[in-house]
Amino acid sequence: MSIGVLEFHGAAGEVTGSCTLLRTDRARILVDFGMFQGTPADEARNAVAPQVDFALLDAIVITHAHIDHCGRLAMATELGFRGRIYCTTATHELLGRVLRSSARLQRARFYERANGSAPWARALMPGEAPGGAPEFPTAHRLFDTPEVRDTMERIEGVPLDREVKIAPHVALTFRNAGHIPGAASAEFSIGVGAARKTVLFSGDLGPDRSALLATPHRPAGADVVIVESTNGERRRDASDPEETLAGIVARAAEKKEKVIVPCFALGRAQLLVHRFARLRTRELMRGLNVYVDSPMAVHGIEALYKHPEYLADEPREIVRAGGAPLWFPELHYVLSKRESMAIDRMVHGGIILAGSGFMDAGPVMRHLEESINREDCTVVLSGYQPEGGFAWKLQRGADRAQFNGKTVPVRARTVRVEGLSGHADQDDLMKWFAGFVQKPARVLINHGVDSARAALAGRLKTELGIECTLPARDVPIEI
C-alpha cells in the first residue's frame, strides 16, 4: 500500500538547503526549509522558491535550528503558507534569534553589495596570484523582521517523545537526534488503525558517543527512513580531541599565543566550551582566558541548561544538581561588536571562539585579518570545510591571505582537531540502523554529497541487506 510521495527540494546530493515535501492522500507536510550555503552562487539559489504550493501545506516541521534546515522559514508566509509550524521546545526558543539574526545579515549584505562595500577574504596557495574582489551576485532580502514575527506566531514547540496530531491522519513525534541543542528526528505516524505506517526523518544525527550531548535516540523501526549522510563516507579518527586541545593550550600558555577557533554557534561552540571546562577541571587551562565571540553560542549554552534532556549523562546530572558544566572562571562571553574588537587588542595568550565555522563570514574573519600574519597565533580547524574555501586552503598550506584587497603573509600555525564533528560518522549511522528490529521497507539517503551517499548505501546493503535510494532534487518518489 502506498503511503504517499516524497519530493526533495534541497540537500539531495549536497549538505545544505534541506527541504522535503511529504504528500499523503490527505495531507501535505514540509520537513525543513533551510538555506543553501557555500559559494555566492549557492546562496543566490535561496531567492528561488521551491516547487511547493505553500498555500496547500498543512504544516511545516523543523528538525533543528541550524540555518541549512530553518534559514528560509520566514519566507513561508509570503509564499502563501497559513498553517502551523512544529519543532521541539528548545528549537522554538532558538529559532527567533536565528531568524532575526539572518534578517539583519541579509539587510547588511543587501546594502554592502549595492554600494560595493561588501567585505571579502581569500586564502592563497603557494604560487597562486592575488585577485580582485569576487563578483557577488545581487543580494536578495528573503525576509525581514515583520516576516520573522509572523512566522514565530505560527510555531508550536513540542517536547521530545510526545505525539501530536499535525494534519489529517498524520501524527508527529520528535526523538532526540544528539546533534545540537533542540535537534530531533521527526517520526510521522500516517494512517489509522492497523494500516498506520511510520515515516522517519533522521534529521541531522549526532555521534554515537559525545562527552556533552546525549546519544541519538535508537528507533526500533520504521516503514520508510530518510537518513542524512553528511559523514557517510567518513570514519572518526581515534584520537582524543581533548588531549589535542590540551597540547594547544599548553603551547599557548608557554608562548603567550593567541588561539583562534572558527566554530558554528550552535553545536561546535558548546562542545568546545565543554572541552575547555573539562581541561580547567584537570587544572590544564593554565590561566588562559577563553572568549566566546558569539551571542548565539551563548544562547545555545543557556538552552542546554534549560533543557538538560539533550545532555549526556554526566553533564545532565551536574545541571540537575545545580552545577554548570559549561562554565569556568576564565570563560568570557563577548556580546557586542565593540567587545569583539577589543579582544583583538587585549588577547595575548588567550583563546577566541568565533563564527563562522566555514570561515566565510562573521567575526572570525576580522580576528584572522588582525592576527594571521603573526607567528604567535594558532588557528584551530575542525569538522567539514567546503572545498576551495578559505579554511580548506589554509589547512592545505596557504601562504598568503587577502582581506578586502590587502595581501598579508600567513605566519600563523594551523592545527586540525579531529573528533569534534556534530554529525554521526559512517560507523555511527550503521549502529543506528543496526538497532532496527525489522528492516525498513524503504531507505532514502539525503543531506550528503553523492560520494558520501553512495558509500553509506553500499555499506548498508553489504552488511545489513538494506537497499537504498539516492533521491534527485525535485523528482517525486512514491513510498
Describe every region a protein language model picked out.
Residues A12-G17, T24-I155, L205-A214, R396-N404, ...:
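Pre-active-site segment of Zn-dependent metallo-hydrolases
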Residues F33-Q37, D58, R196-S202, D208, ...:
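Acidic/glycine-enriched edge-of-secondary-structure segments
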Residues M1-A55, D150-A214, R338-R345, I351, ...:
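Core dinuclear metal-dependent hydrolase active-site scaffold
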Residues R84, P181, S185, G206-D293, ...:
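Cap/insert and terminal regions of metallo-dependent hydrolase folds
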Residues S102-N176, I180, P308-H348:
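Metallo-beta-lactamase
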